[in-house]
Amino acid sequence: MPFGKPLVGTLLASLTLLGLATAHAKDDMKAAEQYQGAASAVDPAHVVRTNGAPDMSESEFNEAKQIYFQRCAGCHGVLRKGATGKPLTPDITQQRGQQYLEALITYGTPLGMPNWGSSGELSKEQITLMAKYIQHTPPQPPEWGMPEMRESWKVLVKPEDRPKKQLNDLDLPNLFSVTLRDAGQIALVDGDSKKIVKVIDTGYAVHISRMSASGRYLLVIGRDARIDMIDLWAKEPTKVAEIKIGIEARSVESSKFKGYEDRYTIAGAYWPPQFAIMDGETLEPKQIVSTRGMTVDTQTYHPEPRVAAIIASHEHPEFIVNVKETGKVLLVNYKDIDNLTVTSIGAAPFLHDGGWDSSHRYFMTAANNSNKVAVIDSKDRRLSALVDVGKTPHPGRGANFVHPKYGPVWSTSHLGDGSISLIGTDPKNHPQYAWKKVAELQGQGGGSLFIKTHPKSSHLYVDTTFNPDARISQSVAVFDLKNLDAKYQVLPIAEWADLGEGAKRVVQPEYNKRGDEVWFSVWNGKNDSSALVVVDDKTLKLKAVVKDPRLITPTGKFNVYNTQHDVY
């Protein structure tokens, strides 16, 4: 990464003092930063000025505040205490000074902070503003409690006015919910005809879609913490309720334990750091629980421990909640929400995403900045193991398959390197391999967000969405599960889409219900053409390209059946 000649010595020396410059693989770490640095929906309400910081007009402060929450908050945190990125509090930034900070923002760091200036993403004037801004005390966004939730809550169609049976002719189990990130929408796509059924307005940049246990209700949550509940039984799939559970969020889930199907919905917020339990038919808020508290490693207080992945237990009437910065997994029992019980399991800091092993008993969850996978036994309600894996694991839900030697394994790819880690998951029949990294495959490179296979498939797909090499980010690696010693095959997904100019990042393999097709998003800029590409899983040949002007920045895709039944 180039540095301006007059600043080379000063900048590198300062970076060393800050502990930011190491000899890590720059491209792979840049991929991780690019992912974590996604725009935040947080908008603090007032201007803060700090002794010792450069003067800023109100308009300058507000402009810089907006840039920070679009570009920086995902890594450095809302309160700038540090998360994936380093702390940027005034005691540190004022000591470094304006010139150093401008150089840092312009050229980035060898550890992976993006080069906002030399890449052209921020102007010189914007960089000057940002260097001033981070020398001020961070403005704290407002809290979001029950009054705010209830004010945002809307029941658009009352439960008693909803249909008693499915009124449309859609093959619901093979329907896909596709995130249209920058449009603030989802597209419902028929998996058989490959046509868009309906585009529905949602919150900003939907992060995930989840199905209720019955398969009737689709729940989507935007990064602005807005949840939309969509009734798939209606004559035309229709939004029936919505609520905002905070200011920024990533996760939503529905109760799945026998006897409690569809009864409750839970969602977790990045800000304020909390989760909320709601009525499963109306989204009426019932309970809010803060996640602020002590970290699992140093037992120090953290003011901003964000809620990441949430998964519904099949063993108990519980939600399993990842708390990112504290490194704790919470078992939230919803048997009696008026007397809510929460069990805290210490795991490792920076818990993020994960999914079930093939038995649906063990929750395999990545602590991405700790380079570990935590194994949570949902039946015995305890930590079974912490497994060391590669750099910055990001499994999505992960991928389960049967290895010829090690038996059932769960696998994850990584943002920070090109490895794929395989972890044994069968303590009964293969105890010598259980909860150990039994093998490691090598893919195209770092920058992976998702890995996927299917019980009926003999292939394993690995994307590399945030790899800085366009040839890699625009393609996927496919491993033959019957011959893992063979080199992976590369599928030129973006080339098959034939879109012309643009980044054309390929993201998230997703199977159809039958497990014989794999769908990919070709994610282009908001003003460019994007597409969905469908691959025949048996032949690895192109089967279809879905193009439509309404497919604006498609990213995540969620097949109704596979999401409902945790098939991955």
UniProtKB/Swiss-Prot annotation:
User: Known InterPro entries for this protein?
Assistant: Cyt_c-like_dom, Cyt_c-like_dom_sf, Cyt_cd1_C_sf, Haem_d1_sf, Host-pathogen_enzymatic-act
Tell me the cofactors it needs.
heme c; heme
Q: Where is this region: N-terminal tail?
A: 26-54
> Which reactions is this enzyme annotated as catalysing?
nitric oxide + Fe(III)-[cytochrome c] + H2O = Fe(II)-[cytochrome c] + nitrite + 2 H(+); A + NH4(+) + H2O = hydroxylamine + AH2 + H(+)
Residues in Cytochrome c domain copies: 55-140
* Gene Ontology, cellular component aspect: periplasmic space
The note describing how and how many cofactors are bound reads:
Binds 1 heme c group covalently per subunit. Binds 1 heme d1 group per subunit.
Q: Which EC numbers does the record give?
A: 1.7.2.1, 1.7.99.1
Query: Which Gene3D superfamilies does the record match to this protein?
Result: C-terminal (heme d1) domain of cytochrome cd1-nitrite reductase (2.140.10.20), Cytochrome c-like domain (1.10.760.10)
User: What span is annotated as the signal peptide, if there is one?
Assistant: 1-25
- Localization in the cell: Periplasm
Which GO MF terms are attached to this record? electron transfer activity; heme binding; hydroxylamine reductase activity; metal ion binding; nitrite reductase (NO-forming) activity
Residues the entry annotates as binding heme c:
C72, C75, H76, R96, T109, M113
Q: Per the record, which residues fall in region D1-heme domain?
A: 141-568
Q: Which residues bind heme d1?
A: H207, R250, S251, Y270, R397, Q508
- Keyword tags: Electron transport, Heme, Iron, Metal-binding, Oxidoreductase, Periplasm, Signal, Transport
Keyword Cytoplasm in record: no
**PROSITE patterns referenced in this protein's UniProt entry, alphabetically:** CYTC
Question: What does the subunit comment say?
Answer: Homodimer.
Q: What is this protein called?
A: Nitrite reductase
State the organism named in the record.
Pseudomonas aeruginosa (strain ATCC 15692 / DSM 22644 / CIP 104116 / JCM 14847 / LMG 12228 / 1C / PRS 101 / PAO1)
